[in-house]
Each structure stands twice: as C-alpha cells, then as structure tokens.
Amino acid sequence: MKKGTVLNSELSALISRLGHTDSVTVGDAGLPVPDGIQRIDLALTHGIPRFMQVIETMTAEMQVERAVLAQEMVEANPDIHRQLVTWLQRLAQTQGNAIHIDYVSHGQFKALSGESKAIVRSGECSPYANVLLYAGVTF
C-alpha cells in the first residue's frame, strides 16, 4: 500500500506527471468539465470532501508556483477565499518560493480550466470554490 499523502491512484498519477507550468483545476461540485479534459471525481456527497481538504492534500505532493482564482470568489465566497489565500501563503513559505495569485472573471476561469491536465472535482457546494494550480519545480 502506498505510504504517501495522496492515496487516490488517478490523483497521484496526475501529480507525478506534471511538468513545469502545467495546470490542474480543483473545483467545486458544480464546475463544468470540458470535453477532452480528464475528470478526477472525488465528490462523495454534498460537502465531502471539502474544497480545502482537496487543496491541502494535493499540495502536500505538488510544487505550486501560481494560482488563478475567479475574482467573483472574493465577494461571493469570502471564507473559502480567505482560507485558500492563507493556505497558499503558508505553502509558499514551506516550499521556499513565491506563489503568484492572479484573478480573472469566472468566464475566463472556465476557459483556462479547459487547458488543465485535469479537473479535480471536490464535494464543495459553495460558490466559486475553484482554483487553477500551476506546477513549479523543486529545484
């Protein structure tokens, strides 16, 4: 049995295949997945797993250099926004690099998610609980 943090085989494989600047979208239960994009569906029921549980688990094994959020998240979901930004700041300290955070419209976000290697669906049922994570390098 795998001893690392990520036990889901699809998610573990995805993270191990990421190259520099590749992106992965982590989304709420309602984020659409464009045709041709891998869907890794972790949702069990409403709220399980939570968005931040997925983020915390993934970033334990993924080097992150950039994050893109929908600007609508700031007002429509301030609690998740605060938790995510705080987590990314802590992650940057742990990794020893800056993580740039960019904001785009939700429409632009959905278009960018179509360029992701995969969209990871959480069970989160709150508005705009989505982020694009861009892979960095560990050296």
Swiss-Prot record:
Job description of the protein: Catalyzes the interconversion of beta-pyran and beta-furan forms of D-ribose.
The keyword Isomerase appears for this protein: yes
Record EC number: 5.4.99.62
Subunit structure and binding partners: Homodecamer.
Positions in coiled-coil regions: none
GO MF entries: D-ribose pyranase activity; intramolecular lyase activity; monosaccharide binding
HAMAP family named among the record's database cross-references: D_rib_pyranase (MF_01661)
Keyword Cytoplasm appears in the UniProt entry: yes
Reaction(s) catalysed (UniProt annotation): beta-D-ribopyranose = beta-D-ribofuranose
Organism listed in the record: Edwardsiella ictaluri (strain 93-146)
Record key words, sorted: Carbohydrate metabolism, Cytoplasm, Isomerase
One GO term describing the cellular component: cytosol
Protein name: D-ribose pyranase
UniProt xrefs under InterPro entries: D-ribose_pyranase, RbsD-like_sf, RbsD_FucU
GO biological process, one term: D-ribose catabolic process
Binding-site residues, substrate: 28, 106, 128-130
Lineage: Bacteria, Pseudomonadati, Pseudomonadota, Gammaproteobacteria, Enterobacterales
Functional pathway: Carbohydrate metabolism; D-ribose degradation; D-ribose 5-phosphate from beta-D-ribopyranose: step 1/2
TM region(s), chain numbering: none
Gene designation per UniProt: rbsD
Protein localization: Cytoplasm
Residue pairs linked by disulfide bridges in the UniProt entry: none
Family stated for the protein in its record: Belongs to the RbsD / FucU family. RbsD subfamily.
